Amino acid sequence: MVRVIAMDGPSGSGKSTVAKIVAEKLGWFYLNTGAMYRAVGLFLADRNIPCDENAVTGNILKQADVDFDPDGHIVLNGNDISDRILTPEAARHASDYSKLPAVRKLMTALQRKIGLSRPSVVEGRDIGTVVFPDADHKFFIVASPKERARRRFLQLKEKDPGTAITIEEILKQQNERDSQDQKRALAPLKQAEDAILVDTTEKTIDEVVEEILARL
């Protein structure tokens, strides 16, 4: 049976970085489901499709070809959008459109297909609760709101040194997104009962990786 490690948590908690390194150390595939939702969100927003379940249909979603290239970069309809999905705009669209049943259904099916094709470290917001409830190992990665905003700010500044966004603005957007993710009726962000809680606020990446590997 294909093995799966599930890592959930809010954006900026460090789960993406940690999941990727853990996957590399194990020689497993790294599946970033948040990137997939951001890709679909951008696809729909670019086409000015309302965030409404009557507007976002299966036929429209079939036009969004979401995949990963050999280097693990997210690809939408043949275009590498790895940089674009890091923007606050992409995060907002992902949170909005992910509330729609048609989007969740398509993404969940695609994530299961990819994740079960080989041993995988899968990270997102509902992996241990919805996508892979029977995962071999589950971790819920968190960090303080201020630390998460600081990390996102540094990430954006690295990509675009001239960006005008402030940490305060990122924190405000982040809090709004967290509230949406936690309160949505469909697959809300929450810790699975059998998931191990890992707080990365005052830990280095290496410390978190070693902590997780020690628990496998």
Where are these regions (language model features)?
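Hydrophobic anchor at the beta1->P-loop junction of P-loop NTPases
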Residues: 5-7
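ATP-binding Walker
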Residues: 12-13
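Walker A/P-loop
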Residues: 16
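N-terminal phosphate/diphosphate-binding loop that engages ATP/GTP or pyrophosphate donors
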Residues: 25-88
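Small-molecule kinase domains that catalyze NTP-dependent phosphoryl transfer to phosphate-bearing small molecules
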Residues: 60, 111-118, 125, 129-130, ...
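ATP-dependent NMP and nucleoside kinases share a basic, alpha-helical "lid"
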Residues: 82-159
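Glycine-rich phosphate-binding loops of nucleotide-dependent enzymes
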Residues: 138-141, 145-146, 152-156, 194-197, ...
